[in-house]
Structures are given as structure tokens and as C-alpha cells.
């Protein structure tokens, strides 16, 4: 027997039968936190929905609009660049239908 006569066979299963559809809405804590100048924000949309994520300063003034559009159900992650802002505490708020959640983050320069 020679090595040229060797045959290998394998069955590979690569069928995905269902898509992942989250059932809840969720806004995760940004990371890193504190940050300089960028941070990531992860959020989950439970059903197809118009989604808004905005950033506010400590006085409640809107300083950035990160998302303002219809989103299909799924898990998302975005990057926030705070390089144009001063050091301090900021809040980011997710609104999707009747769901609202706010988290705090800190920019340190």
C-alpha cells in the first residue's frame, strides 16, 4: 500500500435551521467605562422597531444622536466617539416603542 492510495471522507453538517430573534429589549453598559475618547455600546432590539439612542450631558442637553431609525430584531453594537466632548459624566438613552432605558458613562481626558 502506498500513501497515494489513501482516501479520506467526512460528512460536514452546516445547516442552520432557524434565525436568532431576541424577545427582549436591552441596553448594555458601555465598555470601556470610563473611556477616552471612544467606547462601545451594545443593545438588543426584541422586535422590528423604530430605535433612538441619544447621548446627554449632566444637565440633560442632547450632545449626540447615535441611532434614529427603524431596526429589525437583533443585537447591535456601535462605537461612540467622545473626542469633541469635555471630560465628565454622560447618559445614553435607548427608546424603542414603549421600552426606555438609560445608562451612565464617564469620559476622562
Q: What residues fall within each predicted segment?
A:
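Short beta-strand edge segments in extracellular beta-sheet folds
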Residues: 9, 104-109
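Extracellular carbohydrate recognition
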Residues: 1-11
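Glycine-centered coil/turn sites that cap beta-strands in beta-rich domains
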Residues: 17-31, 35-55, 65, 77-80
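Short, surface-exposed loop/turn motifs with a glycine/proline- and acidic-biased composition
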Residues: 67-98, 102
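A generic beta-sheet turn/junction motif
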Residues: 34-36, 96-98, 109
